[in-house]
């Protein structure tokens, strides 16, 4: 596996970065070759720029330096990774350092009115407003994320505040994700709080928001190619089962038109999975995305992550479906951010504890 991953004959690009990281992980985890792993992780770090990837590089460099007793350098690597506390690996590094939440993540940014923005009279912005009035949210998002490609921090805040003022979290997230590509973090827009968190008493509000954010980006109109519907992207067959369990009349139409109905059924299904896996958020999140059958297969291959002797971090890295692996990471990182934003206080970062149990 190492030979195939490391002899890629590439010098840059996304595939180069992925293969360098994989070569480093194999070297450290399976070959007991930390110095070799360090070289690959450094190559990966130099090849990437996004917050998620930079945090990933810092975390694994910290791990390999910790393994070779270079504790001072490991702390520096973890600290660099922890600068990206909105990310999965940034939170792993923060947890390793015993850090609490960065206050900027739950303090609302300086509220700048979009009405005073430099772009307010531009054709693209005016078109986005018309699309919003016509309830064409996907097209509205296209226009606003295009604008976000070139705006500075303050103008991005103003643009996201239009979406916030008009209760369009789907567009807020799109703007924030575009800003994050340039290293500009807008926490309120990146992790918008919605009243949907109160629609079910079966799950903590941060879990509902984290799942809905990943599933639909809080877009009630979302429909997947597989036929999953609405905020929680629940399949009609699953929704029918959950409606029967809750004593509700099943309505496919309401899955898209009634956000409370959608969230109640989606939350009931996720809660069923959490109970099935005896409180494991990690297994329940993976099953919500890939299905319980696949998760049970992975447990046979890689062990039970509820076992204290099994690393939940390594278990996540071994999820063979890239989509599910990424899904678990994105939902997990959102949990802590939503928890502190809802409560308005700094809390110790506890990502691995969240994955281990509910």
Give residue ranges: language-model regions.
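Alpha-helical segment of the N-proximal tetratricopeptide repeat
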Residues: 122-139, 143-146
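Extracytoplasmic low-complexity/disordered linkers and repeat tracts associated with LysM-containing
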Residues: 113-116, 127, 349
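Long, contiguous interaction/recruitment modules in multidomain scaffold/adaptor proteins
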Residues: 86-90, 95-104
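TPR-adjacent "capping" and linker segments in tetratricopeptide-repeat scaffold/adaptor proteins
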Residues: 10-15, 109-122
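N-terminal pre-domains immediately preceding structured catalytic cores
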Residues: 46-48, 56, 131
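Catalytic glycan-binding domains that act on GlcNAc-containing polysaccharides
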Residues: 1-23, 32-36, 41, 50-56, ...
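Short coil/linker segments at helix-helix boundaries
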Residues: 103-115, 186-188
């Amino acid at each position: 596996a190492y030979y195939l991953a490391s002899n890629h004959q590439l010098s840059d690009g996304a595939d180069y970065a992925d293969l360098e990281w994989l070569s480093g992980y194999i070297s450290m985890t399976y070959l007991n070759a930390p110095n070799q792993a360090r070289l690959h992780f450094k190559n990966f770090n130099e090849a990437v720029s996004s917050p998620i990837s930079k945090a990933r590089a810092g975390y694994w460099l910290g791990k390999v330096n910790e393994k070779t007793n270079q504790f001072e350098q490991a702390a520096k690597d973890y600290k660099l990774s922890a600068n990206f506390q909105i990310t999965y690996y940034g939170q792993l590094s923060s947890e390793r350092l015993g850090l609490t939440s960065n206050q900027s993540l739950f303090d609302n940014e300086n509220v700048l009115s979009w009405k005073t923005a430099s772009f307010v009279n531009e054709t693209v912005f005016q078109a986005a407003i018309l699309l919003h009035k016509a309830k064409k949210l996907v097209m509205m998002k296209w226009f606003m994320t295009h604008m976000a490609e070139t705006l500075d921090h303050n103008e991005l805040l103003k643009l996201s505040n239009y979406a916030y003022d008009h209760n369009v979290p789907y567009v807020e997230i799109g703007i924030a994700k575009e800003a994050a590509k340039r290293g500009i973090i807008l926490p309120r827009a990146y992790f918008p709080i919605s009243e949907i968190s109160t629609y079910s008493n079966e799950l903590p509000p941060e879990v509902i928001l984290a799942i809905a954010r990943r599933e639909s980006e809080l877009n009630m109109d979302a429909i997947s190619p597989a036929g999953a519907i609405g905020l929680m992207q629940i399949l009609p067959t699953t929704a029918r089962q959950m409606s029967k369990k809750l004593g509700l009349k099943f309505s496919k139409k309401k899955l898209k038109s009634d956000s409370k109905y959608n969230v109640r059924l989606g939350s009931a299904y996720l809660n069923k999975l959490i109970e099935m896996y005896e409180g494991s958020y990690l297994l329940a999140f993976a099953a919500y995305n890939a299905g319980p059958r696949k998760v049970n297969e992975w447990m046979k291959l890689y062990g039970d992550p509820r076992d204290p002797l099994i690393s939940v971090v390594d278990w996540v890295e071994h999820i063979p479906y890239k989509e599910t692996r990424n899904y678990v990471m994105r939902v997990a990182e959102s949990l802590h951010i939503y928890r502190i934003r809802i409560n308005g206080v700094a809390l110790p970062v506890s990502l691995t504890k969240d994955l281990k149990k509910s």
